[in-house]
Amino acid sequence: MQLLIIRHAIAVPRGTPGIPDEDRPLTPEGEQKFREAAKGLAKLVDRPDALLTSPWLRAKQTATIAAAAWGRLEPKEAAALASGSFDDQAAVLDEYPGDATVAVVGHEPWVSELLARLLGTRHDARLEFKKGGAALVDVPGRLAGGGQLAWFLPPKVLRKL
């Protein structure tokens, strides 16, 4: 499996009065910058077989922008991508065949923890994703360990592709 891990784009700050964390939207700047980054993603990765997203608003908005860059791709919500454990996330991903390319959009710290687990490192020895950043991992078999990092890019680089 090829797994494309994307952190949601820039959202309104946590603690904004009247907006619960799960309802924080992308900022106009976040939307604009991620539209550019998504074009770069589409150049690096052919249209995935599936695009999964956390049900939280900022992740869904990020997934919708990514889907538009690939064309004809409908994001599917997966609750485990909001706050689930690695086992819950792995169960969602195990629904896809080993030759699939799956993109997931989620939040820190789980995107970094997921990447660390896929690469077989300690969960606290992680690469931290910038908002709108992405990583591509080739996963040869089981999801825990053994993955090969193809690339790990911040949004600034994705926007320049």
Annotate each language-model stretch with its function:
Residues 89-91:
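Conserved ATP-dependent adenylate/AMP-binding module captured primarily in the ANL superfamily
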Residues 3, 98-106:
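Generic beta-sheet signal
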Residues 2-87, 111, 125, 129-131, ...:
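Active-site-proximal alpha-helix that buttresses catalytic centers in soluble enzyme cores
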Residues 108-109, 116-127:
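Flexible, glycine-rich active-site loops centered on histidine and acidic residues
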